[in-house]
UniProtKB/Swiss-Prot annotation:
NCBIfam families: PRK13255.1, TMPT_Se_Te. It comes from Pseudomonas putida (strain ATCC 47054 / DSM 6125 / CFBP 8728 / NCIMB 11950 / KT2440). InterPro entries: SAM-dependent_MTases_sf (IPR029063), Thiopur_S-MeTfrase_Se/Te_detox (IPR022474), Thiopurine_S-MeTrfase (IPR025835), TPMT (IPR008854). It catalyses: S-adenosyl-L-methionine + a thiopurine = S-adenosyl-L-homocysteine + a thiopurine S-methylether. It is an enzyme of class 2 (transferase). It is found in: Cytoplasm. Pfam families: TPMT. Belongs to the class I-like SAM-binding methyltransferase superfamily. TPMT family. This is Thiopurine S-methyltransferase. S-adenosyl-L-methionine binds at W10, L45, E66, R123.
Amino acid sequence: MEPAFWQQRWADNQIGFHQAQVNPYLQTYWPQLQLAPGSRVLVPLCGKSLDLAWLAGQGHRVLGVELSRRAVEDFFREHGLEAEVRQQGAFEVWRSGDVQLWCGDFFALRAEDVADCVGLYDRAAVIALPVQMRARYMQLLSGLLPANCRGLVVTLEYDQSLLAGPPFSVRDEELRQGFAGWQVEQLEAVDVIEDSPKFVQAGASSLLERVYQVSR
């Protein structure tokens, strides 16, 4: 999947993956991670998610990584924030207060960029990537993030033969294999097929949304 795909989705405003409210799983389960105030949290493929502002509101320093400059611009504009912009390596870094959005290719991140990220939040990153890219993505996370990191990961599981994706289906065993070396605990699994007409029309009988806590 090429970067141009996501750039075009944002250009055409085809952003059905964007949620108009803070994710309820985040609000429910994030507190149990017990991250200290001021902890830095990595949010891969963040878009203009409202979850970024929520995390900052909990006292965290937020590092979102997003390919689309349009998404980054929209986040700061929609929150009424003035951002300082600078170049750092392969990324254009936008900053306002405790929120930094790094505009560029996630796979260009270096270990020193995220060495102090002790939190991870992935609601729509791993499910946005086809199988080979998401294996590379999870391997990169494990290689970059420090040993004391913990966070939340949200996945979807359905019959992939019915829909091409994204979002892509990620099976439980694939997620656990991708986070080998981490402690992986499933916190919740909910069938959301009744709220997902696209999947119903495609013939899917279930759409399982899973929430995991990952830590090491």
